[in-house]
Every structure is written in structure tokens, then in C-alpha cells.
A protein has these predicted regions:
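Bacterial N-terminal signal peptides
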Residues: 8-16
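Domain-level marker for long, solvent-exposed, non-transmembrane regions
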Residues: 20-152
Length: 152
């Protein structure tokens, strides 16, 4: 009886660990060039069509800038914070408007597809060179209260 109990408990634990596995999305964002005010990156976006894949690519760039930072660039540290889920929850209104309202496009200086659309398991992917206006983005984050002004 005791062996059956241990078997059931172990089976339940293994089942729970398998079900709770978190799959983190890959950012696939690579730094190309930049200054203090702008950054250019190459990013892979995925979507059901070319437009959706490009929007996905642009949004990945902002996720990296906000929550991870971009090594080798002027923006090595995350702009907002490293706890993505907590920051998005704390500033839900801002991020909903930023992504769902496509407000992120106001900070994209250029978005140039450099590859054709290719089929992948989750839809279609495209490689895009994206240039972002960092100074305007930083100013917007300060105005919205997500980050503090430098030196104040």
C-alpha cells in the first residue's frame, strides 16, 4: 500500500512539472549600429502574414530594450526593468496602448524587410532591420512615469 502511495505521489509531481513547463520566446534581436539617440537592429518576426510578422519583429525590439538591454549598444541595461511580467502588470495601461494600440510605431524610424517571408511551424517569419528613436522613447517613458529622469 505504501509503495502505491509513493507511486501516485511521484506520478502526480512529474505530471505537474511537465504541465508547468514555461517556454520562453526567443527574442532573435541582433545589434547592428547606433548612437546615443538611435539604435539599429536586425530581428526575426513571426506572424500569419507579412504585416503581422513585421509588427511582431518591431515589438520584439521594444521588449529587448525595455526588459533585457542590448549588448554592444548604448542601451546595455534594460530601460524599464528586468522583471518583464511585473513591469507589464504594474504599467498595464501603458503597455496595452503601446503594443495593442500600435503606439510603438511612433518610435520606429524605419522598418526594412531584408528577407522574404518563409514558412515556419508557428506561421511565417521575416527578417527585418529596425531603427528605433531611443531619445524619444526614453522621453516618453519618463513622461509616463515608467522611468526617472537621469540625475533627478
Amino acid at each position: 500500500m505504501r509503495g502505491l502511495f509513493h507511486f501516485v505521489v511521484m506520478s502526480l509531481l512529474i505530471f505537474m512539472m511537465i504541465c508547468c513547463k514555461t517556454i520562453y520566446p526567443s527574442a532573435e534581436v541582433n545589434y547592428l549600429s547606433g548612437t546615443e539617440q538611435t539604435v539599429s537592429v536586425r530581428v526575426i518576426g513571426v506572424g500569419s502574414n507579412e504585416e503581422q510578422a513585421i509588427i511582431n519583429a518591431e515589438q520584439k525590439v521594444f521588449d529587448v530594450l525595455f526588459f533585457r538591454g542590448l549588448p554592444e549598444s548604448q542601451q546595455k541595461m534594460p530601460m524599464v526593468g528586468s522583471d518583464e511580467s511585473a513591469e507589464k502588470l504594474k504599467n498595464k495601461k501603458y503597455f496595452d496602448k503601446f503594443y495593442d494600440g500600435k503606439r510603438h510605431k511612433t518610435f520606429v524610424m524605419s522598418s526594412i524587410p531584408v528577407s522574404g517571408l518563409t514558412k515556419v511551424n508557428s506561421g511565417k517569419s521575416i527578417t527585418v532591420n529596425v531603427k528605433v528613436n531611443l531619445s524619444a522613447l526614453r522621453s516618453d517613458l519618463e513622461t509616463s512615469g515608467l522611468i526617472r529622469k537621469f540625475g533627478f
